[in-house]
Amino acid sequence: MTAQPQTLKIRRPDDWHIHLRDDEMLSTVLPYTSEVFARAIVMPNLAQPITTVASAIAYRERILAAVPVGHKFTPLMTCYLTNSLDVKELTTGFEQGVFTAAKLYPANATTNSTHGVSDIPAIYPLFEQMQKIGMPLLIHGEVTDAAVDIFDREARFIDQILEPIRQKFPELKIVFEHITTKDAADYVLAGNRFLGATVTPQHLMFNRNHMLVGGIRPHLFCLPILKRSTHQQALRAAVASGSDRFFLGTDSAPHAKHRKESSCGCAGVFNAPAALPAYASVFEELNALQHLEAFCALNGPRFYGLPVNDDVVELVRTPFLQPEEIPLGNESVIPFLAGQTLNWSVKR
C-alpha cells in the first residue's frame, strides 16, 4: 500500500474566476485570495458593471490598494459585454493590457447581470474582433428562457448558443465557466485547444441532494445551481483525467449573511478561504494528486498564453478548520464548509 503524502508542493496557483466585490466586502475577502493565489480573473459584475477601460483601471487600483502587505497578487481585469459595447473600447482595453478577457453574461442569468446581453448574435461583431486579436471570451453558460427548467439551462446553452458561436468563430478562445453538468464536461473534452473550462470546488464536492435533503442549505446555493449526482461524478472524472482543458476557477462569490439566509437568498458561495485545501481533498479522493498542480497552476496560464508562476505553495496534511463566519463590519460572511475540517492546509 502506497503511503499517503504528507506534503504537496505545487507552483503557486491562479484563480481563473472570482468575485471580489467592492468597498468593505473587497477589503474583507481579498486577503483570502491574495495570500494563496498569484493572479485572479476578476469578474466585472459590480452593481455598476465594468464596461470601460477607465472603470477597469479604477477597479484594479481599488483592488491593489486592498492587497495586504507581503502578498504578491495581480488582478486580471475583465470587460462586461453589453448590447451596446463599443468594439473600440474592448480592443483598446485588451491592447493596453487592461482587459485580459471579456465576460458574457446572458441578461439576468445571475447576480448583477441585468446589464448583460439579451441578443447574443447581435454582438457577433465583438466576437469577430476578439477572435482577431486573441482575446478570450468567458461565458456564463446558461440560457435564461423562463420556460427552461433551472437544472437544464446549462445543457440547453450548449446547443442553442455555445455551439453556434464556436462554429462561426472557430479560433475564438472560449472559457466555459463553472461547468456543472456531464453535458458540459463531455463537450469540453470533445473540443479543441480553443475551448477550456473552469470547475468550482463546490460542484466537485457536492450535488443538489446536499443542498436540499434534510433542510435547505443556502450557503451551497450558487448559479449555475448544483446538479444531480451523475453530473457531479462526471465533473470529478473530467478533472481526474488530467485533461489540460480544465482549470481552477473558484467562482468565489461572497454575500453578507443576511443576504444568503433570507426568504429570497442570493446565489453565490464564498469558498476562497478553503479553496486550495478543498481541491486537494477532491483530487486525493480521486487518486489524482498527480494532476493537481496542472489543474491549479499550469492549464490556466497555458490557455491564456501567460507564464506560469515561479514560486510555489506547500500543502501540508494538517487539519484545517474553517471558521463558522468571518466578520464584515457589523455583519458577517459565511464561508464554504463553515465549521468543517479539511485534511489539507496551506503552509503559511
UniProtKB/Swiss-Prot annotation:
Q: What is its EC number?
A: 3.5.2.3
Q: Which UniProt keywords apply?
A: Hydrolase, Metal-binding, Pyrimidine biosynthesis, Zinc
Q: How is the cofactor bound?
A: Binds 2 Zn(2+) ions per subunit.
Annotated residues that bind substrate are located at 19-21, 45, 140, 223, 255, 267
Please name the Pfam families in this protein's record: Amidohydro_1
Give the first-level EC class, as a single word.
hydrolase
Protein name according to UniProt: Dihydroorotase
Lineage, highest ranks first:
Bacteria, Pseudomonadati, Pseudomonadota, Gammaproteobacteria, Enterobacterales
